[in-house]
């Protein structure tokens, strides 16, 4: 993975934002943008970053604070003022409780903001407070998940990244994850990185650059391991040209759009119509032409970052009858009906 750090860009960023919270916060926002610019690390709204500092209260006291990205904010456009300040000491005390619900935890996060007008901090805020480094970065890196989301995933991670990495099983983000992280750090206080199975990777450092470069280094190791270990070869069972694919798109797109349109009850705009974005690239066509493409396409996504955008599974049409529009329409109807039923079942 490319290390996007640039001394020139960093200096320009500091010059632009130094006046808000100082140089370190400017660099914190700068490296957050570097992470957000890499879609194989995070997508819009995913991941989170933080830095520990202090807030001066009305009595002139400097109170330890954790400054963390607000939930859902985009790392690619972070500025120093986009970080939410939370009472650091209280966060650590919170993790000493035996159990609280996620709803209670979110309430506690909000009641211990230093500015009540600030947006809600990430659900993973207590984790950032526990980790020893001053700066913390968390991503849902594709290369890491490609290793964790398979049989013997932990073994793959340890082989790729080394035994000094803490590896935790999948735990739903929230209070229980924070408790498990606290226990793991207590057992290995020198650890600077942790992989959460089926979730992502979190690293820390004493400066924004150190933490960022640790993230890039570890993800790069995972990428190298994947390339060296790849043995699966998928033979192509057909070869669809771009010309043929475009012709098929012109046939199928109106049928899909018509079936996705929904009545609104508004006589001026009777239908809520959908616009489709075709993904017609040589790589996509080559993938769909390989043996076993159906099983791969109908595998769940790697991460919640992807899930938000793709949903749990796509609608799939077996052997589309492009030369018979009536049959093709029936195939699409059946596929969409099955998709809706499966998705409703997933929600329930």
Segments predicted by a language model, with ranges:
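Glycine-rich flexible loops
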Residues: 1-348
């Amino acid at each position: 993975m490319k290390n996007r750090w640039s001394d020139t860009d960093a200096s320009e960023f500091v010059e632009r934002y130094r006046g808000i919270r100082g140089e370190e916060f400017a660099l914190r926002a700068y490296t957050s943008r570097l992470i957000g610019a890499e879609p194989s690390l995070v997508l819009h709204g995913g991941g989170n970053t933080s830095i520990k500092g202090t807030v001066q209260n009305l009595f002139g006291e400097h109170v330890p604070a954790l400054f963390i990205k607000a939930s859902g904010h985009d790392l690619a456009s972070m500025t120093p003022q986009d970080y939410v300040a939370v009472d650091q000491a209280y966060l650590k005390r919170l993790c000493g409780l035996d159990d609280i619900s996620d709803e209670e935890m979110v309430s506690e996060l909000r009641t211990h903001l230093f500015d009540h007008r600030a947006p809600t901090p990430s659900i993973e805020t207590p984790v950032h407070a526990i980790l020893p480094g001053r700066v913390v970065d968390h991503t849902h890196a594709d290369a890491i998940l490609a290793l964790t989301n398979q049989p013997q995933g932990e073994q793959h991670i340890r082989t790729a990244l080394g035994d000094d990495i803490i590896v935790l099983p999948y735990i739903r983000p929230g209070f229980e994850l924070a408790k498990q992280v606290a226990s793991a750090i207590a057992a290995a206080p020198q650890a600077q990185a942790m992989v959460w199975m089926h979730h992502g990777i979190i690293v820390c450092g004493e400066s924004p650059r150190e933490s960022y470069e640790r993230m890039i280094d570890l993800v790069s190791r995972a990428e190298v391991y994947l390339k060296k270990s790849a043995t699966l070869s998928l033979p192509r069972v057909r070869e669809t040209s771009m010309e043929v694919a475009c012709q098929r798109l012109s046939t199928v797109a109106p049928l899909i759009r018509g079936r996705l349109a929904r009545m609104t009850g508004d006589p001026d705009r009777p239908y809520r119509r959908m616009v489709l974005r075709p993904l017609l690239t040589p790589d996509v066509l080559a993938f769909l032409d390989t043996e076993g493409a159906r099983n791969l396409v109908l595998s769940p996504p790697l991460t919640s970052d992807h899930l938000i955008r793709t949903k749990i599974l796509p609608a799939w049409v077996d052997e589309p009858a492009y030369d018979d529009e009536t049959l093709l329409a029936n195939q699409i109807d059946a596929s969409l009906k099955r998709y809706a039923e499966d998705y409703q079942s997933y929600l329930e």
